[in-house]
Amino acid sequence: MSIKSDKWIRRMAEQHGMIEPFEPDQVRESDGRRIVSYGTSSYGYDIRCADEFKIFTNINSTIVDPKNFDEKSFVDFKGDVCIIPPNSFALARTMEYFRIPRTVLTVCLGKSTYARCGIIVNVTPFEPEWEGYVTLEFSNTTPLPAKIYAGEGCAQVLFFESDEECETSYKDRGGKYQGQHGVTLPKT
């Protein structure tokens, strides 16, 4: 299994629709101002956060249960900047829609710009033949409110291709998050 380069990422996005919308270069400015970068990098793709958020609140519940998650634990927010309360988290989704090839697995890591501010981005791997918008989790580990910027970079996806095709893909298993379009809450 080897990591894939910018040339491979561009080819797969442009010829096979692996990432839509796709930015073939690294974007660092918008309207003359510096932003958190996004687009193709040497061995990865920096994804952007859309403007749809679900901000965690503890007002309506007393326990967090991944098997029986209460939707009322979140406040919906739409905007260019999301403020995450201290020691809390928010869910969002990518602007990009992904179609992962059968021989590919991705690993997604948060960008250091956010990590250096105490904001951790968590995303699980994109499995072979998974497709959809990616649900992102932003944890604010600080005792202060933290900003997340929609339309800017938030994490980097690394693509690994196996030299052998998997026997059963995410699509074959009927994965519960296949084809997700909005911010998707936990499912069992």
Swiss-Prot record:
Residues of the active site: E137
Protein's name in the database: dCTP deaminase
Similarity comment text for this entry: Belongs to the dCTP deaminase family.
Transmembrane spans: none
One MF annotation (Gene Ontology) recorded for this entry: nucleotide binding
Listed InterPro entries: dCTP_deaminase, dUTPase-like_sf, dUTPase_trimeric
Reactions catalysed: dCTP + H2O + H(+) = dUTP + NH4(+)
Chain's gene name: dcd
Enzyme class, first EC level, given as a word: hydrolase
EC number: 3.5.4.13
Pfam families for this protein: DCD
GO biological process: dUMP biosynthetic process; dUTP biosynthetic process; nucleobase-containing small molecule interconversion
Pathway: Pyrimidine metabolism; dUMP biosynthesis; dUMP from dCTP (dUTP route): step 1/2
UniProt keyword Nucleotide-binding, yes or no: yes
Subunit structure, interactors included: Homotrimer.
Record lineage: Bacteria, Pseudomonadati, Pseudomonadota, Betaproteobacteria, Burkholderiales
Organism listed in the record: Ralstonia pickettii (strain 12J)
Keyword vocabulary terms for this entry: Hydrolase, Nucleotide metabolism, Nucleotide-binding
Role summary: Catalyzes the deamination of dCTP to dUTP.
Amino-acid positions noted as binding dCTP in the UniProt annotation, renumbered to this chain: K111, S112, T113, Y114, A115, R116, T135, L136, E137, Q156, Y170, Q180
